[in-house]
């Protein structure tokens, strides 16, 4: 499994010499195996994610603060791809995930209506992911939400990874 942190900052992206070591992008984690790709959050670091063309792709949101969604419209692969990308969050059902992103990326607050423009984004309920991805790839996708801490875990027979995000 390949794990890449494309952003780890909170609030706003920053630049300059002081940020060269850890980077200045907001939250985005990319997990790739031979079977699938899981992207957690689409902060400003999402612009650097290469979206796989040869395996299922899942984009999960830990929550919908600005620093976790602001990069969604700036990934060239997402804008060019014609294949399905599954979008979900453990916090809300699929329709509320879609509505939350539509509010942020509509024609009023953003130059284009991104969510309606990108028809290949398939919004799915988090509960359905475990069944779909376990059957197709052998991965298990689970979440345990306690208080202000969202835990999302991806697990294969030989690899386990957990993403812990304290809002």
Where do the model's predicted regions map?
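Binuclear metal-dependent hydrolase catalytic cores
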Residues: 1-167
């Amino acid at each position: 499994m390949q794990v890449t942190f494309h952003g780890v900052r909170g609030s706003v992206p920053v630049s300059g010499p002081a940020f060269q070591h850890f980077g200045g992008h907001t939250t985005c984690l990319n997990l790739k195996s031979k079977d699938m790709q899981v992207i957690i959050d689409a902060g400003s670091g999402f612009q650097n994610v290469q979206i796989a063309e040869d395996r299922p792709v899942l984009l999960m949101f830990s929550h919908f603060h600005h620093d976790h969604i602001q990069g969604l419209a700036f990934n060239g692969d997402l804008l060019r791809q014609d294949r399905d990308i599954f979008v979900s969050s453990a916090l809300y059902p699929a329709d509320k995930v879609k509505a939350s992103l539509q509010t942020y990326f509509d024609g009023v607050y953003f130059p284009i209506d991104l969510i309606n423009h990108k028809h290949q984004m398939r919004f799915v309920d988090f509960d359905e992911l475990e069944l779909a991805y376990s059957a197709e790839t052998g991965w298990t996708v689970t979440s345990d939400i306690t208080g202000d801490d969202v835990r999302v875990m991806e697990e294969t027979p030989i690899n386990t990874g957990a993403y812990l995000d304290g809002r």
